[in-house]
Structure formats: structure tokens, C-alpha cells
Amino acid sequence: MHLSEITHPKQLHNLSIHQLEEIARQIREKHLETVATSGGHLGPGLGVVELTLGLYQTLNLDRDKVIWDVGHQAYPHKIITGRYHNFHTLRQKDGIAGYLKRCESKFDHFGAGHASTSISAGLGMALARDMKGDNFKVVSIIGDGALTGGMALEAINHAGHLPKTNILVVLNDNEMSISPNVGAISRYLNKMRLSPPIQFLQDNLEEQFKQIPFVGETFTPEMEGLKGGMKRLAVSKVGAVIEELGFTYMGPVDGHNLEELITTFNQAHQIPGPVLVHVATTKGKGYPVAEEDKVSYHAQNPFNLATGKALPASKPKPPKYSKVFAHTLVKLAENNPKIIGITAAMATGTGLDKLHGKLPKQYIDVGIAEQHAVTLAAGLASEGMRPVVCIYSTFLQRAYDQIIHDVCIQKLPVFFCLDRAGIVGADGPTHQGMYDIAYLRCIPNMVVMAPKDEGELQRMVLTGIKHTDGAIAMRYPRGNGYGVPLMEEGWEAITIGKGEILRNGDDVLILGYGSMVYSAMQTAEILSEHGVAATVVNARFVKPLDTELILPLAQRIGQVVTMEEGCLMGGFGSAVTEALMDNNVLVPVLRLGVPDKLVDHAKPDESKADLGLTPSQMAERILQSFKPRLSTINV
């Protein structure tokens, strides 16, 4: 059977080990070809091919439920659940999503993009099953660092207290998240990987006793106590913590041995209550360069499959925002030992690996633990340090209570640097950084700013470090800057709450925020071709808003447009409208941004076009919205 013939996972049930191994080879081939062409996550999926095949041969996925943690591990799952023939559209507009989506397939039982959610979701399904009197298996597959997340441990704590609730947790232990795992849990798992399988000891103990001359022949049920005692001794050295939490522990199992995996999963399904199967895998399995460099090949842009090297750019590009941020932070930290960079398992993505390389004592990786990262920063700030929490906008959502309760109520000077703010592209709705403006600006003792380009970002990094009167957040987009000149040092801090005028005009006032400022300038240029003269303001701050600048301009010009790469509800445009109303400046306002909808995966430019946020589209909206007031304009 060829992989292309598999349209339903039940077709795996009658395949031999040899046939499954051939399917595994073909899955890796398809996985590699697709990611090399379109980009995407590489190492995680390559590491779970046999795990997926072995597990699915023991399940009926028309009935049984499988919940994949994080989601980017699930490429093999997608390939064998009816998506082989359109897998080439991975992460492309209107194509296969890079993460799990319930609306994409009936086999995507629970959506996932963020880490550590699978056990909670699986336990909820198992409890619902029991309440309804149904009978199906529930399997939560967690790994790629997700077990370091507090939510996963909370779910284990709860599940272990429910001995009659059947749930199987499969730990995909590849020793990694995006970067190598950190912390005591990771160290404990590494010890477990080196130990013999507990279930093997338990299952073979009786047989070994029977082979002992004389003694073996008299093996009786009374000797079960000895058998149990030996099992407890083994567990005490390996899975003691898991067993003490109420789970039956099995493993470690070779995650690339199909026969061993199938046997183990079949055994696990027969054990009542919560069961954890510990599977040891190799991230990037089957592609040597990915096995050797697990960090770089966690995810890749399109690359040369033969060499593993990135495809050359058509022309040189300006540095990425994250690179400029990291370089600036390192320069400042070299002269200020109080600066401490904090990441939640995203050192490479945020650029903090550069700080780790230069100043390891001023760097902390807490693992996938955003809540802990924020309160840790609060503790550091309370002792006079200058903590810088470097985190993707979408992941800071997970620590919202800590921002309010532990940082802002106590007015502690924590600097939040929000990478991937705005439209992120191919990662889709789970990773869009749409909401930070709205969820941060409503908190007292919080300053919120955004640079118009990479040069202003350098100044804002200094501004954030120097700000000690409460918390401050800086949002900046994914991708490359505009190529503006950068300084190695000597940056000037920006006065808190002060914007700047970039262009003057009397017909319409355009207020751009962050990544939309250059688009505002381009829009103004298009408007000028229609005879409309626009004033363009780089707002810089959404909180505090520069009302001293904005209110007189709005009053004089009489027509206001706001532009933001974030949600309109509660966003920058809302802040401007509130300020105008509160100060009795009653002028029409056109807010341009992301409406009340989820933004699916696509290239950022494609998403902006879908949302009407290209300069030409915004110019047209302005002309149409203010047409009665611009009656002399040739629209």
C-alpha cells in the first residue's frame, strides 16, 4: 500500500510492521518535501511518525479521541487522516493549517496551537464521556516541551485524583521544546529515558520467577507481594513521581520501534484509570541535518532539501525586528548588569539567544511557563533589577492575571517586549498578535508603545529600560524592518506619551500606530493624487495617548482616521475615539484595523488585503467615508 492510498486511519489496522515502516518512510518523505517547499515546522513531526502510526493502529478514530498538544507535532496525523493530496497547500492561504483545527477535519478532535493544553482537554472529554455513559478511548499526546507548562501539571494533578476515569497520556519526550528543555522536570525526564521500561519489568517478573529451579515451580499468588514490591522498587527509581500522582506509568518506550509501540499502547488501553506512556523520540528523525541541529530545524522557511540550507533571497533584506531588538538589548545590558532578559522557551525566536551567548548571567529561560515568567520578573523588579520579558504577543495572553496582580497593582517596573505583534501570517489564528493593544491599555500603571520602524525600536528599547514608574510594553511585528539606518549606541530615549508629525495637510488627519505608520504615509501619498492633503502622525504611544498633539489637530482638521495592526475593539482607534469624546472634540472618526473576526493563515500581505489594510484600499475607504465632506475631490 502506498501512503497516497490512505484516506482513513483505519486502513492502518491490517498492515504488517514491515508495511507500517514503509508508510513511515513515505510520511517523512512527504513531510520533508512539503516543508522544504512551503516552510513550516519540521523537527517535531519527523519525530512522531512511528508514534502516530503505532497509536493509530490501536484506535478507532471514528469513535476514539486523540488530542495533540501544541499542534505542530501533528503533520503525520494530518497526512494519514485524508489530507495527503492537499498537504502541499500547508500554511498557504485557503490551504491546510499548520496547527489543528476542528473545522478542518473530523479527526482534529481539539484545536491546538499553544502548548500544554492537551491533558486538560482530554480529561474534559473523558469526564463528559463518563457522564453520558459513552464508551470511547481518550488519548492526549503531549511533548515538545509542553510538560514544562503549569497547565499540564495542573491537569495531571486533577486526573490523578480520578482513578476511575480512563485517560491515556502519551509523553513524546524528545528532550526539546523549540530550544533544549530547561528545568527540574526536564532533568527528571532525562533520567527516566536512561532507565529500563517499568512495564517490561512488571510483565516479565512472573515468567522470570518460574524459570528459577524449585522456587519457580511453587510460584503462588502469595508471591504477588514480592512481585509488587519489585515493581515499586523499579518505579521508585524511574516513574515514582508519575505513579505517586495517581497514574500508571509505562516506559520509556523506543519511539521509533513500531512493534514495541503497538504492544505498549495495546497494554495501556487495558489498564483502568489514568495511564502515562513515556515515549522517547528523536526530534528531526530521518533527516540528518535536523537531528544534528534540532533548534534551527524546529521550523524552517523554504530550504534546499539536499543541503538543508535556506533558499537564497532574491535580494538582500533589512534585518528582522527581533534581531535589531536583541542587538540593542545586548548593547544596553553590557553596561547595565541589572538588565535581565527573560524568555519562556523562545530564546531563538525572540533573539534572546544572543543575550545568552554574550551575557549568560543576565539571561533566564523559564520553559513554557509564561505565568511564572511574568511573576518572576515582578520579583526581580521588586529587588531593583530591570527585568525584560521577551515574549510573543499571543503568548503573553496566558499571563494576563500576573500582569495585573503581580506587576501593575504593585507598580513594578517590568519591561514587556512583545514580538510577533499584529498579523503573523502562516501560523494562523492561534498565533496572531491582534489583542495586546486592547488587553494592555486598560490596565493602570501600564505604558504601551510601538515603533514605526527598526530605528525607532532601538530608541524604545532604551525608553523601556529607563522607565521605572510602573510597567511598560513595546509591541513590534514579525519580519524584516524597512532598512532605516541603525545606531550601534548613543540612542535617545523617547519622552513617554509623545508622538510626532510626519506629514502636514489640512483635509484629513491620519493617526498611524506602530507597524501601520509607513502604510499611513503611503496612503497619504495616494490621497494626494486625488487632491486630498493629509496630516500623518506617528502616535508611538496608545497609552498614554499624546492628546496634546492629537486633540488640536483633530479639532482643526475635522476628520480623523486611525490605522492599527490589531483588533479594532478596544484598540488604538478606540483609544483615540475615547479621547476625542472625553474632550468634546466631536469629529468623524474612521477606524482601520482588524474587525471582530479571526484571521486565518496566509501570507501577511494576503491577510492585509483580505482585511482592507493595504494603502490603496485604505485610501479608497477614506475617500468614500468622507466623500460628503470632500465633495470637491475627484473620487
From Swiss-Prot:
Thiamine diphosphate binds at H72, G113, H114, A115, G145, A146, N174, Y287, E370. SUPFAM superfamilies: Thiamin diphosphate-binding fold (THDP-binding) (SSF52518), TK C-terminal domain-like (SSF52922). This is 1-deoxy-D-xylulose-5-phosphate synthase. Keywords: Isoprene biosynthesis, Magnesium, Metal-binding, Thiamine biosynthesis, Thiamine pyrophosphate, Transferase. It is an enzyme of class 2 (transferase). Mg(2+) binds at D144, N174. The keyword Repeat does not apply. Catalyzes the acyloin condensation reaction between C atoms 2 and 3 of pyruvate and glyceraldehyde 3-phosphate to yield 1-deoxy-D-xylulose-5-phosphate (DXP). It comes from Trichodesmium erythraeum (strain IMS101). GO terms for molecular function: 1-deoxy-D-xylulose-5-phosphate synthase activity; magnesium ion binding; thiamine pyrophosphate binding. It catalyses: D-glyceraldehyde 3-phosphate + pyruvate + H(+) = 1-deoxy-D-xylulose 5-phosphate + CO2. Belongs to the transketolase family. DXPS subfamily. Its EC number is 2.2.1.7. GO terms for cellular component: cytosol. Binds 1 Mg(2+) ion per subunit. Binds 1 thiamine pyrophosphate per subunit. Pfam families: DXP_synthase_N, Transket_pyr, Transketolase_C. Homodimer. Transmembrane segments: none annotated. Coiled coil: none annotated. Its cofactor is Mg(2+); thiamine diphosphate. Pathway: Metabolic intermediate biosynthesis; 1-deoxy-D-xylulose 5-phosphate biosynthesis; 1-deoxy-D-xylulose 5-phosphate from D-glyceraldehyde 3-phosphate and pyruvate: step 1/1. One of its GO terms (biological process) is 1-deoxy-D-xylulose 5-phosphate biosynthetic process.
